[in-house]
Amino acid sequence: MREKMTEQETYCGFIAIVGRPNVGKSTLLNKILGQKISITSRKAQTTRHRIVGIHTEGVYQAVYVDTPGLHIEEKRAINRLMNRAASSAIGDVDLIIFVVDGTHWNDDDEMVLNKLRRAKAPVVLAINKVDNIKNKDELLPFITDVSQKLEFKEIIPISAQRGNNIHNLEKIVRTSLRKGVHHFPEDYVTDRSQRFMASEIIREKLMRFTGEELPYSVTVEIEQFKLNDRGIYEINGLILVEREGQKKMVIGAKGQKLKTIGTEARQDMERLFDNKVHLELWVKVKSGWADDERALRSLGYIDE
C-alpha cells in the first residue's frame, strides 16, 4: 500500500518597517536578510524607495517593506513623495515594525504613531540602538511611558547594528505570518532589479563620502547596465545635483572624491552581483529636479 504524500504547510506575510528618518530601519532590514540591499548612512533620507526584502527560512517567508522615513516637513516634492511611499506601505501588511532611536522620542515619532493608530495590522515597537543607551535605568520608564501611547503587540529593545535581540524579533514576525504559499523562490532576497540596486549603492557612497557637504538634492540614474562579451557588467551612472558647487563637491580635488566613490561602489556591486563590474560615473547639474514631479517620475520616484 502506497503511503499518502502530504505537503508541509507554508507561511507567508508582508511586514512594513516604519519610523522617522535615521532610526536604523535599513540597518535592521539588512541584518535580518544577512546582506545589504537597503542603503544606510548616518544621514536622514537615505532610503527613498520602498525596498522589498525577502527572508525565507524553512516554511516561513517574510516579505519586508523598508520605507523612507516619515517627515513632518513636506515643502519639497521629493519629501511629499517619500511620505506617500511610507504611508502606503502601512496599508496592506500583516505586521508593522515601528523603529525608534533608543529613548529619543520626538515630534516625528509622534507623527508616525498617529498614522499607525489608523493601521489595521498589529504594531511591534522596536527600540533600536539600545547599546548606545549609557544609563540602562532610562529604558524601563521609557517603555512604561510609550506603552500608554498605543496597544503594541510587543515592545522589544534591539540593536540592529550589533544584531542584539534580532532573533527574538524574527520569532515575533513568524507568529504574524499567515498560512499560504510563498510569493517568491526561497533564494530571492529582493524583488528589485540589479540596475536599481546599482543606483542605490552609488547613492550610498555619495552620502558617505560627501560628509555634511552635500544636501539631499542628489540622485543617481543608471544610463547603461549590460553584460559584455567578456562576462563583465558595464555600468554607466549619472549623478544628478542641483548646483554647480555641488558638482565640484562630488568630483573633489583632481577628481579624487568621485574616484573613491566609484571604487567603493564598484567593489560593493561585485560582491552583490558576484561578478566583475566596470563602472563609469559622470556628474551633471539638473536644477530643481527634487521639486519637479515629472523628473521624479522619470527617475523612478513615482510608481506608474
UniProtKB/Swiss-Prot annotation:
GO terms for cellular component: cytosol; plasma membrane. CDD domains: Era, KH-II_Era. Residues 19-26 are annotated as: G1. The keyword rRNA-binding applies. GO terms for molecular function: GTP binding; GTPase activity; ribosomal small subunit binding; small ribosomal subunit rRNA binding. GTP binds at residues 19-26, 66-70, 128-131. Its main location: cytoplasm. Residues 66-69 are annotated as: G3. Residues 158-160 are annotated as: G5. Residues 11-186 form the Era-type G domain. Residues 210-287 form the KH type-2 domain. Signal peptide: none annotated. Keywords: Cell inner membrane, Cell membrane, Cytoplasm, GTP-binding, Membrane, Nucleotide-binding, Ribosome biogenesis, RNA-binding, rRNA-binding. Residues 45-49 are annotated as: G2. SUPFAM superfamilies: P-loop containing nucleoside triphosphate hydrolases, Prokaryotic type KH domain (KH-domain type II). It is found in: Cytoplasm; Cell inner membrane. Residues 128-131 are annotated as: G4. Belongs to the TRAFAC class TrmE-Era-EngA-EngB-Septin-like GTPase superfamily. Era GTPase family. An essential GTPase that binds both GDP and GTP, with rapid nucleotide exchange. Plays a role in 16S rRNA processing and 30S ribosomal subunit biogenesis and possibly also in cell cycle regulation and energy metabolism. This is GTPase Era.
